[in-house]
From Swiss-Prot:
InterPro entries: TROVE2, TROVE_dom, TROVE_dom_sf, vWA_Ro60, vWFA_dom_sf. Residues 465-643 are annotated as: VWFA-like domain. The gene is rop-1. Its main location: cytoplasm. A divalent metal cation binds at residues 482, 484, 549. It comes from Caenorhabditis elegans. This is RNA-binding protein RO60. One of its GO terms (molecular function) is RNA binding. One of its GO terms (cellular component) is ribonucleoprotein complex. It is found in: Cytoplasm. Belongs to the Ro 60 kDa family. It holds the Pfam family TROVE.
Amino acid sequence: MADELNEFQEAGNFNEEALMRLSNVCARLRRMQMLESDVEITVVDGELKRVPRQMEKVKDGQVENNAGGFVFPVSDETQVRRFLILGSDKGSYHQSSEKITIDNAQRIIKIIEQGNGHMVLKELALINAENRNPKMNAMIFTLAICARISTHDTTKKTECPMLNAYSDYIRALHDSALDLIPEVCRTPTHLFEFVDYCQTISESTKAGGAKSSTGWGRSMRNAISKWYTTKTTEKLAMLLTKYPQREGWSHRDLFRLAHPNLMDSRSHGQSEDRLEREQLFRFAVKGDLVKRKRKMSVEEVAEVEKVWDKKALKLPYTEEQLIKEEQSRALNLVEAYLKLKNEQSEEVIVAAIKKHGLVREHLPTTSLNSKLVWETLFDVSMPMTAMIRNLAKMTVVGALDEKRVDNIVKRLTDQEELRRSRIHPINLLTARAVYAQGRGDKGSLTWEPNQKICDALEAGFYKAFVNAPPTGKRYCLALDVSGSMTSRVSSSPLSCREAATGMSLINLHNEAEVRCVAFCDKLTELPFTKDWKIGQVNDYVNNLDFGRTDCGLPMTWATENNLKFDVFIIYTDNDTWAGEIHPFEAIKKYREASGIHDAKVIVMAMQAYDYSIADPSDAGMLDITGFDSAVPQIVHEFVTGKI
């Protein structure tokens, strides 16, 4: 059963027909907006009002750009994609755990308010279906905005056609967003995050003296109920037990707010899994199960009926439903989970893992220091990402004997398994750095690294190049060689140099046209080819002279030498500019001189906390601060022109 919830969640194919009604409503609203371009609609005291359109205020520090040069314009679609993938509608990605707020999404809100909600949800659904977003928070936040924006009393009709059209648009937008919940919120963690964002948006978008909205109207209740009722019983049991609570929310909270009632569905009464599902719903609310009906005495049945759903009791259970409950694997899993909460016996825990396919999250915390428990978790087909994440823990408890080490080496160097698991090379490089250092960043966990595993992680890094698809672009990769590049990347065991050389090797191996240069206050061409290993590259760079950092040099060098590149990637630690020409100006001059008007530049400052080189109005510039597992996918999306 654990296989149903593998580490990588497959998304379904996007069905555009599901958004057809919203598309038609949007088109009608935009036609009306074109006729009344001097007004806009807002919510005042819970009602829609027409107000004169205001010129957008120029933000503090913004000035009109008269510098000239070629600028690659940013469309509304690009801004939406940037927000969904980067977590920002500007040309920047910040490796940070900070929570997204309504202030981060003002441009997205403006696009929706202008009647383009269909485009926003279409982009969201497509990116989600293709698994193009490396993180879920911006995706879920956008879905919550679409589900809660401009909440008003939809029962009141006015004599103004435009207000009525806007009201229809908002209602269709809310309905379409709620319909997407099962596809976007694939785990309870996502669902809890969505609900939390909805509550935040409801509170922060109250206008004037509007009465506070709980956010739990009929549509919201039905959507949350549907998330639970459409799961198979075995998958629902796994979800309820593996993810009992997150983000300050629990399944019990959602059930008490959404009031899902299985008997509201006409088909439920005749469903074979009716009793099984009613038991799971009880577990979600009460945290326990009642004895299965086939095993109850008459007295026990009478006691249970006192607290059971009265609607359910009106319809007798069929023989098939009683048999299904009695033999239920889903209920067996929940019972095993409940029994293990205070279990101390390793033998009992191990037997439960083998019988029910339990995963780490099901087990009591005290058992996670057991060698036998980890041996069993590994042996019952541990998913690749879970195996990589737990290498250190399994080494500490002594669970990795020679046979299991050989198994790990085989899996890490199996290109087909790496392909199926979609493990990016950088994830393996990072895992190697974590494992090889023999200690954790938090707590007192230390271990003696197994050299075979270290070597396999590096070998897997090269094998996993298949998971970094080529873009067909011409690259100039510029590596800062200043001494500070040996320091660690923010929130990572990799040094800035290791991260830069790792990313560079992926491009060198997978792309047809790549040139590497080293820069500080001067520029040096590098002899790297796809045959070089990461150790060779690091040793070579370590022997170069270094000075101050001039991030404009690579573009200036390419301009002066009439070289043709589609993409410049600047790898540095913290200093982003110390030269005569700003990178912002250097790329514009390069575009003008080369005729490659959509040439792109990425400045990756891996230790910086907050900086901005990119012009947010230029779709060909991207800032990245910090470095994490999301960066490679973000770079690919940017280079291929998708954000």
